[in-house]
Amino acid sequence: MDSLDRSCQDWCDRKQHWLEIGPPDLVERKGSLTLRSHHKKYSKPVLVYSWHRDREAFPKGYDIEGPEKVKKLCNSTYRRLGTDESPIWTSETHEKLSQMCLNTEWVEMKSKALLNEETVSSGIIERVTGLPATGFGAVFPRHPPDWSKMCALTTYSEDYVPPYDYQPHAYPCQDDYSIVHRKCRSQFTDLNGSKRFGINTWHDESGIYANSDVKQKLYPLTSGPIVPI
């Protein structure tokens, strides 16, 4: 009876092993790259056959294959509740996918100066090299003092020079935004306009315009009530 049970168990093991490795012509040999081994235990870094099944069965936050003699499956992620650790565990994939909501193109970049007090030293620029300071052969080329004079020279200033020096007369700046000389819409002749001011827009004959007060101050009444135009 024992031999029958043992033979049945061997047949089941061989059947299961045959279903896992595939056809009989792909029999696993020791030293092969498939690593479909049932009699030897590999470490976690070695990705053997059906390694993902074991990883999915592991509880989070607890090493099921640790050196402890007595295994405690309750030591999983739930032991972190109520502690001072990070409240939410975020996977690396979730963190990378959440970056699509961040617009990094409009992030303000801090400008860094090329020259500052630490990188610039007066001894480097003003050192004695034995070469002329300006002109041909100078280490640091510099423009002559009258370099910008060529931008100010014109034909008129060169050919039509004033005969003597004189001080130009400074005219006072007048108020160019005055409404004294502005022509307003007439209440008596411009009757075709629809945008008129007043209570009765079509028969406003008060004679008061927007610049009437300014005209009275500029042209005071001297001889008659007629205001000059």
From Swiss-Prot:
- Transmembrane ranges? 124-140
Principal localization reads cytoplasm
Among Pfam families, the record links this protein to:
CFAP95
InterPro entries attached here? Answer: CFAP95
What upregulates this protein?
Down-regulated following embryonic stem cells differentiation.
Which sequence ranges are listed under topological domain Extracellular?
1-123
Give the sugar-modified residues.
N75
Residue ranges that the UniProt entry lists as topological domain Cytoplasmic: 141-229
- Renumbered to this chain, region (Mn) spans 153-163
Q: In which tissues is it expressed?
A: Expressed in undifferentiated embryonic stem cells. Expressed in airway epithelial cells.
Outline what the protein does. Answer: Microtubule inner protein (MIP) part of the dynein-decorated doublet microtubules (DMTs) in cilia axoneme, which is required for motile cilia beating.
Q: How does it assemble?
A: Microtubule inner protein component of sperm flagellar doublet microtubules. Interacts with MYH9. Interacts with MYH10.
Q: What is this protein called?
A: Cilia- and flagella-associated protein 95
